[in-house]
């Protein structure tokens, strides 16, 4: 009887260890094979969007991220002081890491952070995002978004970010990331080149 009790105890211990190991491994596999999906991709803490705009952008970010296997996220804060940070870059990087944004083992993705009260923005990249979003490309993207933000049209700025992010990822995957010598053509310069033909 004692042998059966010991075997049963050993079996339960082994089963408990197996269940614990499986439970701990599931989150690691989930991140390794895709997205952690712990937080919304549209985080409007500053409250600059209407509910409809927030939902529209969340859907657009979700669709883009899944289609590209690349996490595209946006966050707003009232000010750096409100989150107890001095640096946009430090807060954006910490937020990206804390929320476990990114796709796969390299955590491929991009985060646009906007501090409304400070009138500042920062783009944080990780994994393949570093290739897809070069410094020159980020500067160009900022030039496309800031007129909307200056007018208080944050939804317009964020729609622009989503659309250009899709283009940036495609360009990088085609082997031509937007950079100093390969920035998108301005519509006016394209028209002028057609006129000269």
Regions found by a protein language model. Name each.
Residues 3-15:
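Bacterial N-terminal signal peptides that target proteins for export
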Residues 29-191:
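Folded, non-transmembrane soluble domains that reside on the lumenal/extracytoplasmic side of membranes
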Residues 14-25:
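Bacterial N-terminal signal peptides
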Residues 195-197:
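Conserved small/polar residues in nucleotide/adenosyl-binding loops
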């Amino acid at each position: 009887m004692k042998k059966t009790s010991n075997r049963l105890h050993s079996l339960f211990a082994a089963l408990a260890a197996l269940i614990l190991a499986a439970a701990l491994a599931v989150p690691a596999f989930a991140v390794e094979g895709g997205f952690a999906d712990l937080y919304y991709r549209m985080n409007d803490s500053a409250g600059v969007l209407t509910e409809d705009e927030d939902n529209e952008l969340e859907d657009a970010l979700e669709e883009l991220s899944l289609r590209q296997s690349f996490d595209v996220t946006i966050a707003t804060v009232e000010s750096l002081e409100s989150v107890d940070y001095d640096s946009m870059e430090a807060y954006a990087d910490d937020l990206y890491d804390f929320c476990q944004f990114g796709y796969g083992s390299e955590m491929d993705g991009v985060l646009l952070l906007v501090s409304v009260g400070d009138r500042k923005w920062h783009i944080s990249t990780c994994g393949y995002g570093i290739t897809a979003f070069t410094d020159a490309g980020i500067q160009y993207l900022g030039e496309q978004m800031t007129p909307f933000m200056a007018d208080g049209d944050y939804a317009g700025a964020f729609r622009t970010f989503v659309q250009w992010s899709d283009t940036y990822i495609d360009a990088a995957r085609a082997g031509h990331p937007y950079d100093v010598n390969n920035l998108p053509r301005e519509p006016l310069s394209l028209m002028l080149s057609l006129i000269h033909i």
